[in-house]
Amino acid sequence: MEKFTTLEGVAAPLRTINVDTDRIIPAKYLKTIRRTGLGKSLFAEMRYREDGSENPDFILNQPAYRNSKILVCGDNFGCGSSREHAPWALADFGIRCVISTSFADIFFNNCAKNGILAIVVSPEDLEKLFEDAERGANATLTVDLAAQTIRGPDGGTLHFDVDEGRKHNLLNGLDEIGLTLERVSSIDAYEQKLAQRTWA
């Protein structure tokens, strides 16, 4: 998993509230267990018209936001079913950070397991970030995970909270397997000690 330290770039504003996982990636695209190739289907029903052409009104189809790695989202982002394909699609598109006032719990946890930092902010801070993002290519956000800050294009900074375990894993690029391998010496020592306790 790619490490997450500092991320700087244009943020795409998606003001829609209650975007569920079926809108993030519709069920018809869930026939694969591969994490790659799903980016083209991200927000498919919003990104594309019925004839398959791009919807020019959708934010990620607009020139300033095509390569956005940060998504500023409306309330309750990632609600609905627990499909892990939703963060897979975001990551495959290139999104590394999503910011909202609230996320569905399972989606929130799945993001961290797939290298995406999900940040919860206050409604007031979210509105400021929306305003910054809506300035387009002339305004960038900088997300610093170590410092737990988001710096806006005018230099203003806001602080966010993050679980220490989640922070450690993202900073070091550790998924659950990587975290286990990081502790393999402790696991080996425990197993050796257990083997000596034949009565256990």
From Swiss-Prot:
Keywords: Amino-acid biosynthesis, Branched-chain amino acid biosynthesis, Leucine biosynthesis, Lyase. Its EC number is 4.2.1.33. GO terms for biological process: L-leucine biosynthetic process. InterPro entries: 3-IsopropMal_deHydase_ssu, Aconitase/3IPM_dehydase_swvl, AconitaseA/IPMdHydase_ssu_swvl, IPMI_Swivel, LeuD. Pathway: Amino-acid biosynthesis; L-leucine biosynthesis; L-leucine from 3-methyl-2-oxobutanoate: step 2/4. GO terms for cellular component: 3-isopropylmalate dehydratase complex. It is an enzyme of class 4 (lyase). One of its GO terms (molecular function) is 3-isopropylmalate dehydratase activity. It catalyses: (2R,3S)-3-isopropylmalate = (2S)-2-isopropylmalate. Heterodimer of LeuC and LeuD. Belongs to the LeuD family. LeuD type 1 subfamily. Catalyzes the isomerization between 2-isopropylmalate and 3-isopropylmalate, via the formation of 2-isopropylmaleate. This is 3-isopropylmalate dehydratase small subunit. It comes from Methylobacterium radiotolerans (strain ATCC 27329 / DSM 1819 / JCM 2831 / NBRC 15690 / NCIMB 10815 / 0-1). The gene is leuD.
